[in-house]
UniProtKB/Swiss-Prot annotation:
Gene Ontology terms describing biological process: prolyl-tRNA aminoacylation
Catalytic activity, as annotated: tRNA(Pro) + L-proline + ATP = L-prolyl-tRNA(Pro) + AMP + diphosphate
Keywords annotated in UniProt: Aminoacyl-tRNA synthetase, ATP-binding, Cytoplasm, Ligase, Nucleotide-binding, Protein biosynthesis
Function text: Catalyzes the attachment of proline to tRNA(Pro) in a two-step reaction: proline is first activated by ATP to form Pro-AMP and then transferred to the acceptor end of tRNA(Pro).
UniProt-recorded name of the protein: Proline--tRNA ligase
InterPro entries attached to this UniProt entry: aa-tRNA-synt_IIb, aa-tRNA-synth_II, aa-tRNA-synth_II/BPL/LPL, Anticodon-bd, Anticodon-bd_dom_sf, Pro-tRNA-ligase_IIa, Pro-tRNA-ligase_IIa_arc-type, Pro-tRNA_ligase_II_C
GO cellular component: aminoacyl-tRNA synthetase multienzyme complex; cytoplasm
SUPFAM superfamilies assigned: C-terminal domain of ProRS, Class II aaRS ABD-related, Class II aaRS and biotin synthetases
Entry's family note: Belongs to the class-II aminoacyl-tRNA synthetase family. ProS type 3 subfamily.
Record note on quaternary structure: Homodimer.
Predominant location: cytoplasm
Subcellular location: Cytoplasm
Organism: Borreliella burgdorferi (strain ZS7)
Domain of life: Bacteria
Length: 488
C-alpha cells in the first residue's frame, strides 16, 4: 500500500479523497461545497466532452448556450419541477446595489429557460425536431458534498429536444440512453444497468426517467446518467405549440438528458487502487509516459534523452497521446509513483541498456509492478497498441466480474423473505434484484429500513417471467423486477 493513500478497506472515503488530491484532479475552493477542477482533472473532462460532443452531433444535435440566471417565475410554471428543485436553489435578490424586481435563480437545470426560448423559435412542423445540447455549469445547494460526486457547482451537458410526436420524443429519450451506455461501457470501461426509474425516483417534471446505474468498489450504486421523457409538461407550461401539416395547432413533446463531472468520480471509484488513479486508455489524457533512467554521466544521459525523443516521435506519429518525464532531480521510483498516481495506462522505461539494445521496457498501470518486459523499437507501436487494447478490455471485465459477484437475487420463497432481503442489504450492500408491486408505500418502507432505493427497473431482466412472483416487502402480486442498492 502507498504511504500517501489511505487503504480502501480501512477508510474508503479518505481513500477516494486522497486520490482526488494526490492525482491532482481537484482541490477545495474557498466556497463551501465547491471544488477547483485542476488541469489534469479538467483534461479528463475535456476527453469526455470531445467524445460525447461528437456522438451528439452524429445524432443530429447542435450546441448552444443559455443564461445561467433564470427568472424565479419561470421555475414556478411547472409545479413538480419547482417542488423537486426548490430546496437546492441559489437565489439572487440584490444586484447592482438594488433589490431586483424579480429574484433570479442560478441555473439548477435549464428546462425552463430553454423552453421559454423554444416558445419563440417553434411555430411550425418545419421547425421540428429541435435538438439542442448545452455544455454548462449548474448550481445546486447541496448539504453534503464530495468532489466530483456531489458539489454545489458542477459541470455537465444537458440536451433538450422538441418533437412533433410522442413516439419521436420517446425514441430520442431511449436513443440518448443508449449513447450514454455505449460511451460509459466502451470508453470508461464501466459496466452498467439501464432502466426506468420508479415514480418516486424520477426527475422532477418528467413523465418518465431512464437511468444508467453503476456499482462502485464499496458496493454502492452511482447514477451515471439520466434521460427523461418530458411529455407535454414543459410545452404546456410555456405554451410551446406548432402548426402541423393539417394546419392544426398542437403542443410539442420533449426530452431532456445529461451527464456531469460525476463520471470522473465513477472512474475513480470503479477502477482505482491504493497506488492511485487507474484510467482506462480510451479516456486517459495521457496514454503513455516515457521515463528515462538517468545515470551520473551527462554524455550517457544525452544519449538516453535523444533515444527517448525518437520513441516519443514514433508514438506521436502513430496517434498516441504520449509525454516524457525529463525530471533529472527525481529518482526513477519517484517518477514511477507519480505516473501511478495519475493513472497513466502505459509506462515505458528507457535506460542505457535499452538504448544499446534498441528497445524499451514496458509496464501497465493495472498490472502488478513486477509486470514488465522489453520490446524492440521495431515492434513498439504494435505492442503498445496491443497492451492498451488489452488493458481497456481487462478493466471492463474486472469491473463486470465485481458487479456479477455483488449482484444478488432475492425473491420471496419458502427459503427467503423480506427479512432475508433486509439482512443482506444491511450487511453486504451491492445490487439486489428483487420483485416489487409498484406501491410507493413499500418503496418508502424499504428505503427507511435499509437505506436502499430502487435504482431502476432494469432492461436486462425485462424478458423474465413474473408469473407467481410477489413483492419482496408486502407479498402482493409483483409488477416489476427491480434493482435495489444503497447509493451516492
Amino acid at each position: 500500500m502507498s504511504d500517501f493513500i489511505a487503504s480502501k478497506e480501512d477508510d474508503y472515503s479518505k481513500w477516494y479523497l486522497d486520490i482526488v488530491q494526490k492525482a491532482k484532479l481537484a482541490d477545495y475552493s474557498p466556497v463551501k461545497g465547491c471544488m477547483v477542477i485542476m488541469p489534469y482533472g479538467y483534461s479528463i473532462w475535456s476527453k469526455i466532452q470531445s467524445i460525447l460532443d461528437k456522438k451528439f452531433k452524429e445524432t443530429g444535435h447542435e450546441n448552444a448556450y443559455f443564461p445561467m440566471l433564470i427568472p424565479y417565475s419561470f421555475l414556478e410554471r411547472e409545479k413538480d419541477h419547482i417542488d423537486g428543485f426548490s430546496p437546492e436553489f441559489a437565489i439572487i435578490k440584490d444586484a447592482g446595489g438594488e433589490s431586483l424586481a424579480e429574484p433570479l435563480v442560478l441555473r439548477p437545470t435549464s428546462e425552463t429557460i430553454i423552453w421559454n426560448m423554444y416558445s419563440k423559435w417553434i411555430k411550425s412542423y418545419r421547425d421540428l425536431p429541435l435538438k439542442i445540447n448545452q455544455w454548462a455549469n449548474v448550481v445546486r445547494w447541496e448539504k453534503r458534498t464530495r468532489p466530483f460526486l456531489r458539489t454545489t457547482e458542477f459541470l455537465w451537458q444537458e440536451g433538450h429536444t422538441a418533437h412533433a410526436t410522442e413516439e419521436e420524443a420517446l425514441e430520442e429519450t431511449l436513443l440518448i440512453l443508449d449513447v450514454y451506455k455505449r460511451f460509459i461501457e466502451d470508453y470508461l470501461a464501466i459496466p452498467v444497468f439501464c432502466g426506468k426509474k420508479s415514480e418516486k425516483e424520477k426527475f422532477a417534471g418528467a413523465v418518465s426517467t431512464y437511468s444508467i446505474e453503476a456499482l462502485m468498489q464499496d458496493k454502492k450504486a452511482l447514477q451515471a446518467a439520466t434521460s427523461h421523457y418530458l411529455g407535454l409538461n414543459f410545452a404546456k407550461a410555456f405554451d410551446v405549440k406548432f402548426q402541423d401539416k393539417d394546419g392544426k395547432m398542437r403542443h410539442v413533446f420533449a426530452s431532456s438528458w445529461g451527464v456531469s463531472t460525476r463520471l470522473i468520480g465513477a472512474l475513480i471509484m470503479v477502477h482505482s487502487d491504493e497506488k492511485g488513479l487507474v484510467l482506462p486508455p480510451r479516456i486517459a489524457p495521457i496514454e503513455i509516459i516515457v521515463i528515462p533512467i538517468f545515470k551520473k554521466e551527462d554524455e550517457i544521459n544525452k544519449k538516453i534523452l535523444d533515444y527517448c525523443d525518437c520513441v516519443v516521435d514514433a508514438l506521436k506519429k502513430a496517434g498516441f497521446r504520449v509525454e516524457i518525464d525529463k525530471d533529472v532531480r527525481s529518482s526513477p521510483g519517484f517518477r514511477f509513483s507519480s505516473a501511478e498516481f495519475k493513472g497513466i495506462p502505459i509506462r515505458l522505461e528507457v535506460g542505457i541498456n535499452d538504448v544499446l539494445l534498441n528497445s524499451v521496457t514496458i509496464s501497465r498501470r493495472d498490472k502488478d509492478r513486477k509486470f514488465k518486459y522489453q520490446i524492440s523499437l521495431d515492434s513498439l507501436v504494435s505492442k503498445v497498441k496491443v497492451e492498451l487494447d488489452l488493458m481497456q478490455k481487462d478493466l471492463f471485465q474486472r469491473a463486470l466480474n465485481f458487479r456479477i459477484l455483488n449482484t444478488k437475487e432475492i425473491f420471496r420463497s419458502s427459503k427467503d423473505s423480506y427479512e432475508t432481503f433486509k439482512a443482506y442489504v444491511n450487511d453486504y450492500s451491492g445490487f439486489v434484484l428483487s420483485c416489487w408491486c409498484g406501491s410507493l408505500n413499500c418503496e418508502n418502507i424499504i428505503k427507511n429500513e435499509t437505506k436502499a432505493t430502487i435504482r431502476c427497473i432494469p432492461d436486462d431482466f425485462k424478458a423474465r417471467d413474473l408469473t407467481g412472483m410477489t413483492c419482496i416487502y408486502c407479498s402482493s402480486k409483483a409488477k416489476y423486477f427491480v434493482l435495489f442498492a444503497k447509493s451516492y
